[in-house]
Amino acid sequence: MSIEQTFSIIKPNAMKKNAIGDIVSMFEANGLKIAAAKITVLTTAKAEEFYAEHKARPFFGELVSFMTSGPVMLMCLQGEGAVLKNREIMGATDPKKANPGTVRAKFGDNVGENAVHGSDSPESAARELALFFEKHEICNV
């Protein structure tokens, strides 16, 4: 496997639980390094742009509302096979179905408020990273 970059969001519900340190420790313990990070509150426009693929879905409005409800932590994670590794660390989308010890099993509340987002492919990672970070903001760690 090669060194990759992937995009990750710690969502508002996990931020409210003060879970940043625990979640970042899980990434680092599994060989992922933080190449960029920022804490912000997403605007409605940015959340709608990020989740544009879900615009026609019935949950879109609720998703945008949740993602703009409080601070999020945006990260570029880097490491060997980072996209897949991050998805394994996160666990299943539904926290009830996530393996014990995964981020979503520990900090997710339900399918919508599942603590974290992670890119599902290298192509998605590139698109998502470009949406939130300038090239000069991402370090090669």
Curated annotation (Swiss-Prot):
Where's it found, cell-wise?
Cytoplasm
Keywords noted in UniProt: ATP-binding, Cytoplasm, Kinase, Magnesium, Metal-binding, Nucleotide metabolism, Nucleotide-binding, Phosphoprotein, Transferase
GO BP terms: CTP biosynthetic process; GTP biosynthetic process; UTP biosynthetic process
Output the Gene3D superfamilies linked to this UniProt entry: Nucleoside diphosphate kinase-like domain
Primary place of residence? cytoplasm
Q: What does this protein do?
A: Major role in the synthesis of nucleoside triphosphates other than ATP. The ATP gamma phosphate is transferred to the NDP beta phosphate via a ping-pong mechanism, using a phosphorylated active-site intermediate.
**The protein's name in its UniProt record:** Nucleoside diphosphate kinase
